[in-house]
Structures are given as structure tokens and as C-alpha cells.
Swiss-Prot record:
The keyword Nucleus applies. This is Uncharacterized protein C2C4.10c. Transmembrane segments: none annotated. It comes from Schizosaccharomyces pombe (strain 972 / ATCC 24843). Keywords: Cytoplasm, Nucleus. Its main location: cytoplasm. It comes from the Eukaryota. One of its GO terms (cellular component) is mitotic spindle pole body. It is found in: Cytoplasm; Nucleus. One of its GO terms (biological process) is asymmetric protein localization to old mitotic spindle pole body.
């Protein structure tokens, strides 16, 4: 996956959030539709058994009520099919976004590991430089001590020579 800038990652996360909300809303609509469909199926069954008279004929009003319920049930079934398609599409989109998110997480993990390796290498170099500087300092300190001792000897020698020859 190509590297994403923080702005692109933010937009990607917003899209993922939006798609999740749409998926949730679609699922809620599907549940409501399923419940309504079941209720209407029960009404159709109830009305057909209730309004069925001894002569096997329906009165005009009873037949219209059954037709109306059956028509509404058919419309709900069609809407149910569309909602299922929407749900499948949203699930596919959600899966794609989840895969994209996984790719981003892998990229971030790889980037973090690479940066940690670089930081460790830099830290080791810093330690080496620090140790070299400390060694140089100690060496210079010893040379300085020797020079101070030499200067003190010269000073003593000069003081003695001044005392001996006024």
C-alpha cells in the first residue's frame, strides 16, 4: 500500500466511519422490514382464515383487505430484496475498508520498526562517539597533567636558580 499522509489517513478514517454508520442504518432498516414483513404475513394468514366463510367466498370488503395486505407484503418483500443487496454492498465496502485499514496498520508497524532500528543504530553511534570523546578527554587530561607537572618542575627549577643567583 502506498504511504498515506496524515490528511489522507484522516479522510480514510472518516470514510470508514461513514460507511460503518450506513451499514448500521441499513441493518436497522433490514430488521424493521423483516419484523414488518412477518407481521403482515401473520395478518394475511389470519385474514384468510378469518374471512373465509362456509360458501368458500369472500365478501367484497374482506377480499380488498386481503389484497391490500398482500400488495403491501409484496412491496415489502421487494424492498427487503433491495435492502439485502444494499447490505451485501455495504459489507463488501466495509471489508475493503477493513483490508485498507489492515494495510495501513501493517505499513505503520513496518515504518515504526524501521524507525526503531534507525534510532537504535543512531544511539549506538552516539554511544561510540561519546566513548571516543571520553577517551580523548582522558588522554588530554593525562597530557595536561603531565604538562602541569612539567611546568611545575620548570617553575621550581627557575625559582631555585633565582634563589641561587641573586
Amino acid at each position: 500500500m502506498t504511504e498515506l499522509h496524515p490528511d489522507e489517513q484522516h479522510v480514510f478514517l472518516q470514510c470508514l466511519n461513514k460507511m460503518q454508520k450506513e451499514l448500521d442504518l441499513s441493518f436497522e432498516r433490514y430488521e424493521r422490514l423483516f419484523k414488518t414483513t412477518q407481521e403482515l404475513q401473520e395478518k394475511v394468514k389470519f385474514s384468510s382464515s378469518r374471512f373465509y366463510n362456509k360458501d368458500s367466498t369472500y365478501s367484497k370488503d374482506q377480499g380488498l383487505a386481503k389484497e391490500s395486505a398482500a400488495l403491501e407484503l409484496q412491496k415489502l418483500k421487494q424492498e427487503n430484496v433491495l435492502l439485502r443487496k444494499d447490505l451485501n454492498n455495504l459489507e463488501q465496502i466495509s471489508d475493503c475498508y477493513a483490508k485498507g485499514m489492515d494495510d495501513i496498520m501493517k505499513h505503520v508497524a513496518t515504518y515504526t520498526a524501521t524507525m526503531n532500528e534507525r534510532m537504535n543504530a543512531c544511539h549506538k553511534e552516539y554511544i561510540k562517539m561519546y566513548e571516543a570523546l571520553a577517551s580523548e578527554r582522558n588522554s588530554l587530561y593525562k597530557i595536561n597533567e603531565q604538562n602541569v607537572q612539567s611546568l611545575n618542575k620548570v617553575k621550581e627549577w627557575l625559582l631555585k636558580s633565582l634563589e641561587e643567583e641573586p
